[in-house]
A protein has these predicted regions:
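A cytosolic small-molecule/anion-sensing beta-strand core signal
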Residues: 89-90, 117
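A short, polar/charged loop-to-alpha-helix boundary motif
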Residues: 103-113
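Immediate flanking context of iron-sulfur cluster ligation sites
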Residues: 125-138
């Protein structure tokens, strides 16, 4: 029997349809089904970058951006655009995610959106008034708007996006004079080179693939 192929599913195992009570039952059961779970997309080029392991003693911007960077590497390994986000409140990580647009086939499944949803669930409310989000690339229009609406206290991003960024790159939603919320904004300077190198390497490899012409203009 041929294993089903699908994006991100390169590990398949036969498992019983019903949980056996004893080893003997497991050995003699004939009704097995094939399942798969994502490990790495089958055609994804290996990620040449390593995760960061910052010291736990200093919980500064570089520490939390390192966690976001690690999320971005996880995205690469799933053949997603390598962008990661981490949300922190009172020194505690309350949201952590990376892009899942391709795997979920959901255009809203950006790292920031998923992290915001996690954080709101963790806090039991949608207002993230005391939270800081660290994200490896400047948020797009959708994510920038969501950050305004979530009342986040501060946004710190690593790489400016002059093409689609909406917090200083192509536009700045945080500067709208009639908006009912404005947050503190740190634009670049925190693991900026590392996050830019990761993104550029990903799209460089993608452009080498047949039929691929995507990318993000990072200046």
């Amino acid at each position: 029997m041929n294993a089903p192929r699908g994006r991100g599913f390169n590990s398949q195992f036969y498992v019983p349809d019903a949980l056996p009570l004893r080893h003997r039952e497991f050995a003699h059961r004939g009704d097995f089904r094939l399942i798969g779970f994502p490990v790495a997309a089958p055609d994804t080029p290996p990620c040449p970058f390593q995760k960061r392991f910052p010291s736990q003693l200093v919980r500064d911007d570089a520490f939390y951006m390192s966690l976001a960077y690690n999320q971005a590497i996880d995205a690469w390994r799933e053949d997603e655009v390598p962008i990661g986000a981490v949300i922190v409140s009172a020194g505690e990580v309350i949201g952590s995610a990376h892009n899942r647009v391709e795997g979920a086939q959901d255009p809203t499944a950006h790292a920031e959106m998923l992290a915001i949803t996690q954080a709101a669930s963790r806090l039991g409310g949608w207002r993230l008034e005391w939270a800081t989000i660290y994200v490896t690339k400047e948020p797009c229009p959708m994510c920038s708007g969501a950050l305004v609406m979530s009342r986040v206290k501060r946004v710190c991003y690593a790489v400016r996006d002059p093409k689609m960024g909406c917090l200083g790159g192509a536009a700045n939603l945080n500067d709208l004079p009639r908006s009912n919320h404005h947050f503190e904004l740190t634009q670049g300077g925190v693991l900026e080179d590392e996050c830019r190198d990761l993104l550029q390497a990903f799209f460089r490899l993608k452009r080498m693939e047949p039929g691929e012409n995507g990318g993000v203009d990072l200046g």
